[in-house]
């Protein structure tokens, strides 16, 4: 890591006089946010090093690496440029500034912070430049030791790209350790996985280039997945991290990784697939894929049709209890067994499928759909606190009239005063209602976004079938 001070002030000499000491009060150092003075670049050759015209990556937030306030103190005109090799994933940091001074907040020690992010990957410039001339054997070894995942929809348009499944040990574990800085920078809330723990695997998206000296592999992205025990005798597959390198994002590699994982889960009869704290975009892609799979899954059609019919014909304003858009329990189990979609994800996709099946111009059914989303979110956010100590209506279906049959009962008060719900004032309830409606609008907007993507992808699928 290179640190350079642009200008060095002459040292001040002290006088030996006994005059009264003068005290000067300077402005408190406001500091500078790391996001404003630090940039990270991904480079493929030595000529790009020290150039700011190369591929810049956009970390989700650099500030959180620098203390609670995310600021760096004690530097004037600070610039931190970090270059990461796309071949070996080593890094080189160039730090420059005009001068340092303690403005009341001390002088931030940059070296341990950068070491905390980049670890042993961070090397001096000469060594960093030398890494470009060497073949990264651990990438080649990891790919060679793995097995290619072949399934319907895998990279038919570009046979040079493939997904390789490897156990997280040996060369693959070493490769992952090199990728950790990019994971920390680009995957919000991520932490390095424990590669010593049993059950970890990686799926690598690689592009193979055949040369005279042999095959050369370029890493485009990866997923880290964990196989863990599910009682009594099955395995669950949890996706811990998915990362596509910045230049290759938007090319469908993340989608390809998810499809490969689904293929593994079905072919090996995994219990189900889960994702650890997915980002909004990853959840968007995942839901789009799962909705497409569900649309082609015949067992859901009767239940889906029944829900859609209820939304079209039911008048929720006259019901004692709101209609719930919940699929039958046996259908949820069938979906888990056949498609390996877990219950929470299926419920999310179910609402999207219902939305897709409704006519957006039918105001009654769309209003009923929104009412169902509202009731679900109200229950999730407010829980039982929203309905304590009050008269309730419980729908009791009978052979006479399903719409009009109900029972009335009072909820019991909690004896412990500390556990009782504080009665809310009308203005508080109004604010709560407004906030809840805003959240419902956001939820429906997200549902509509996935539905639009699914519709577009369905058209593409139909076009492919016609061409074939």
Swiss-Prot record:
Residues where acetyl-CoA binds: 242-244, 249-255
Organism field: Zea mays
Keywords: Acyltransferase, Cytoplasm, Nucleus, Transferase
SUPFAM superfamilies: Acyl-CoA N-acyltransferases (Nat)
Gene3D superfamilies the record matches: 3.40.630.30, Histone acetyl transferase 1 (HAT1), N-terminal domain (3.90.360.10)
Activity control summary: Inhibited by 5 mM of zinc, copper and iron. Unaffected by low concentrations of detergents and irreversibly inactivated by 2% ethanol, isopropanol or dimethyl sulfoxide.
Main location: nucleus
Protein name: Histone acetyltransferase type B catalytic subunit
GO MF annotation terms: histone H4 acetyltransferase activity
A GO CC term assigned to this protein in UniProt: cytoplasm
Similarity comment text for this entry: Belongs to the HAT1 family.
């Amino acid at each position: 890591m290179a640190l350079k001070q642009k200008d060095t002030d002459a040292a001040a000499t002290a006088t030996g006089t006994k005059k009264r000491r003068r005290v000067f009060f300077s402005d408190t150092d406001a500091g500078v946010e790391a996001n404003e003075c630090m940039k990270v670049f991904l480079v493929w050759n030595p000529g790009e090093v020290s150039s700011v015209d190369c591929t810049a990556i956009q970390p989700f937030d650099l500030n959180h690496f620098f203390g609670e306030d995310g600021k760096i103190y004690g530097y004037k005109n600070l610039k931190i440029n970090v270059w990461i090799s796309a071949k070996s994933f080593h890094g080189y940091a160039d730090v420059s500034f005009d001068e340092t001074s303690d403005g009341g907040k001390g002088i931030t020690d940059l070296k341990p912070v950068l070491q905390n992010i980049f670890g042993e990957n961070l090397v001096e410039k000469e060594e960093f430049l030398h890494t470009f001339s060497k073949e990264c054997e651990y990438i080649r070894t990891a790919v060679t030791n793995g097995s290619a995942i072949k399934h319907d929809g895998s990279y038919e348009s570009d046979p040079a790209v493939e997904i390789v499944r490897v156990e997280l040990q040996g060369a693959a574990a070493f490769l992952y350790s090199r990728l950790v800085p990019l994971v920390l920078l680009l995957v919000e809330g991520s932490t390095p996985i424990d590669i010593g723990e049993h059950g970890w695997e990686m799926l690598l998206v690689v592009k193979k280039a055949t040369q005279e000296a042999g095959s050369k592999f370029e890493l485009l992205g990866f997923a880290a997945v964990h196989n863990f025990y599910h009682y009594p005798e099955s395995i669950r597959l949890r996706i811990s991290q998915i990362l596509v390198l910045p230049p290759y994002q938007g090319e469908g590699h993340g989608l390809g990784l998810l499809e490969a994982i689904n293929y593994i889960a079905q072919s090996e009869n995994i219990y189900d697939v889960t994702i650890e704290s997915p980002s909004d975009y990853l959840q968007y892609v995942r839901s789009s894929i799962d909705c497409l799979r569900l649309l082609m899954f015949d067992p859901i059609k009767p239940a889906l049709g029944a829900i859609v019919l209820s939304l079209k014909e039911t008048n929720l304003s006259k019901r004692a209890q709101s209609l719930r858009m919940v699929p039958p329990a046996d259908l949820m189990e069938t979906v888990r067994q056949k498609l390996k979609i877990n219950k929470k994800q299926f419920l999310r996709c179910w609402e999207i499928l219902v939305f897709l099946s409704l006519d957006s111009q039918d105001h009654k059914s769309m209003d009923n759909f929104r009412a169902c989303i509202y009731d679900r979110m109200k229950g999730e956010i407010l829980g039982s606190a929203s309905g304590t100590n009050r008269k309730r209506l419980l729908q009791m279906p009978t052979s006479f009239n399903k719409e009009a049959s109900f029972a009335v009962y009072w909820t019991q008060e909690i004896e412990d005063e500390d556990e009782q719900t504080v009665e809310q004032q009308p203005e508080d309830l109004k604010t709560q209602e407004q906030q809840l409606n805003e959240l419902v609008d956001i939820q429906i907007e997200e549902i509509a976004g996935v539905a639009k993507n699914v519709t577009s992808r369905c058209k593409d699928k139909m076009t492919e079938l016609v061409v074939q």
